[in-house]
């Protein structure tokens, strides 16, 4: 049947000829399976392309890319499977002289996270994940990117707030040489919020190169490393004891955007040879955001964009 249908990509002449670096599709809706027991899989968005070196050809075969993507992603996703998929994409376009292929998969990984203090209480967190793979000249590179939300409290604002509180205490008790401990505690209970530092939800985007011999993506492990370094990840289900514990964590981990970037750099350098970090504080004091970027000394890939 298809033999009788017109194919203008083959039959129609065209006047513009040039090789193309990448041609393909993006934002394809497709499920991915992180393990064999994941059932219907995670809802993902895929982008897939090959190069088109033959300048005289009008275009590539989009349907071949789609069918191969669909076929391979019916299997559990793994670092070992991605080179096979990329090579299949290249081979499917031998008539186009394609030598390179690339793929990105984006999805949200749902993780149940325990509350800080309340026993038996937990809630769901959605972590944006992006896996990018590229094959060129027989060499495959794989990158894993995760996004982590955390709270940041400004050290400068905290110092200014402490000064205001101290000044208020001195002003109200200038007449007294000594105060009972209970009176001091009661004053702090009544006036401890005389001034409060500004804090805000913040986002860290971390991208790492995965070694060629890696056995798994270890997505949860990477998320755990980031949250451990930052110490103030946003919470899901909370009761008052959990909220109080979160306030304590923020007080013990005051940080500028520079501090957050350096914390992540130190943590990741102990586990990955090549990585990139981009952090953004959605300032509650300002109408703009504060940002910082860093990476490994041998960082070779383009920085992530928040």
From Swiss-Prot:
The GO biological-process annotations, alphabetized, read as:
tetrahydrofolate biosynthetic process
Q: Which EC class is the enzyme in?
A: hydrolase
EC number(s) on record?
3.5.4.16
Question: Quick one: which pathway?
Answer: Cofactor biosynthesis; 7,8-dihydroneopterin triphosphate biosynthesis; 7,8-dihydroneopterin triphosphate from GTP: step 1/1
Gene3D superfamilies assigned: Urate Oxidase
Highest taxon listed in the record's lineage: Bacteria
Catalyzes what?
GTP + H2O = 7,8-dihydroneopterin 3'-triphosphate + formate + H(+)
InterPro entries membership? GTP_cyclohydrolase_FolE2, GTP_cyclohydrolase_FolE2/MptA
State whether keyword Hydrolase applies.
yes
| Keyword terms, alphabetized | Hydrolase
Q: Which GO terms describe its molecular function?
A: GTP cyclohydrolase I activity
Keyword Hydrolase attached: yes
Q: Site described as May be catalytically important, positions?
A: 154
Return the similarity comment. Belongs to the GTP cyclohydrolase IV family.
Role summary = Converts GTP to 7,8-dihydroneopterin triphosphate.
- State the PANTHER family in the record: GTP CYCLOHYDROLASE MPTA
Q: What is this protein called?
A: GTP cyclohydrolase FolE2
Q: Organism source for this protein?
A: Xanthomonas oryzae pv. oryzae (strain KACC10331 / KXO85)
